[in-house]
Design a protein with these regions (language model features):
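Central regulatory/effector-binding core of bacterial HTH transcription factors
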Residues: 65-80
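Sec-dependent bacterial lipoprotein signal peptides
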Residues: 1-19
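Pocket-flanking alpha-helical
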Residues: 76-107
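Exported/periplasmic ABC-transporter solute-binding proteins
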Residues: 3-4, 21-63, 83, 112-120, ...
Length: 307
């Protein structure tokens, strides 16, 4: 009887041990491939810093085992490095072309995942004493080639904003070199503030949140020009961006290549959640997925209104 009992125990040990090991291995594999653990550094367009930084604590509050940070640079550098696998995940305000995606996919040796989660825009600003109230996209060349007093001012020579205006207006790069290129958006604000004939181009996200002091200051101290494109004049607002009526709308996207940091995919997935969409709406921007019963976009841009 004792021998029989020992035989049974030995049998159970032999049978159950592999099952136990398999279970432990599965748990380990599950943790290893948990998208919401670990850390990731995402290379991003510096003009997106205000948008992106406010999203980190929301995500990390839900997933405390994950850590997200951003390394900011110009849009041109971020894209160039992504195409050449010097980085593997980027956040930019641009839709990559089919050729850009193909080059990146080849060099990254991976399928490129495009994730557009929100929309921003380019705001056109001027000094309070500037006489005109409309910026005509098709007249960009005349601003750069004639003796007009107006000067176009951008944040830097590798700015995505400058490239967007150049491409939409179909201005030759050799002519566009006549535009003023400074070092940052802050420099653009200073220059326009001190020069009555300057026209500046800045991210809408800097002034979209009426509850932020910096946004309030920008709204109060600058003139905002409506934009004319193809004979249609549109003022910038959350609503005109949401309805894609404003001609200078820019998609905010994260592109993922051969990125080994799974938290990058976890964070990107979270950007489509209701919590992020609500935060973007409250900051005056437009999420790609607007939460049901939460549609409350501003139908008119009033720089003087701060609340």
């Amino acid at each position: 009887m004792q021998f029989h009992l020992k035989s049974i125990l030995l049998y159970l040990t032999v049978v159950l041990l592999p099952i136990s090991c398999t279970s432990k291995k599965s748990d380990k594999e599950q943790n290893q491939y948990d998208w919401n653990t670990g850390s990731v550094v995402i290379v991003a367009d510096s003009n997106l810093s205000y948008v992106l930084e406010q999203l980190i604590p929301i995500y990390e509050n839900f997933y405390p085992a994950a850590e997200v940070s951003f390394k900011y640079t110009s849009e041109d550098i971020a894209i160039s490095d992504f195409k050449n696998k010097r980085n593997t995940i980027i956040a930019i305000e641009k839709s990559l072309t089919a050729d850009e995606i193909a080059v990146a996919a080849h060099n990254q040796d991976a399928k490129i995942l495009e994730n557009t989660f929100a929309y921003d825009a380019i705001a056109v600003i001027a000094n309070k004493s500037f006489k005109d109230s409309v910026f005509v996209v098709e007249n960009t060349v005349s601003y750069l080639t004639t003796a007009t007093a107006a000067k176009l001012v951008f944040d830097n020579s590798k700015s995505g904003i400058a490239r967007a205006i150049m491409q939409l207006s179909k201005t030759d790069p050799s002519v566009f070199k006549n535009a003023y290129s400074l070092n940052s958006v802050s420099d653009v604000l200073k220059y326009v503030s001190n020069n009555a004939n300057a026209i500046g181009f800045i991210p809408y996200n800097l002034l979209s949140n009426r509850n932020e002091k910096e946004a309030q200051a920008i709204r109060a101290n600058f003139k905002f020009l409506s934009v004319s494109y193809r004979d249609t004049i549109t003022a910038i607002s959350q609503e005109s961006i949401a309805q894609q009526q404003y001609p200078l709308v820019r998609p905010i996207s994260i592109y993922i290549g051969n990125c080994p940091d799974l938290a990058g995919q976890g964070f990107t997935n979270f950007l489509f959640k209701q919590q992020i969409s609500k935060a973007l709406l409250l900051s005056g921007l437009v999420p790609k997925n607007i939460p049901a019963r939460e549609v409350n976009v501003t139908d008119e841009f009033n720089p003087e209104k701060t609340k």
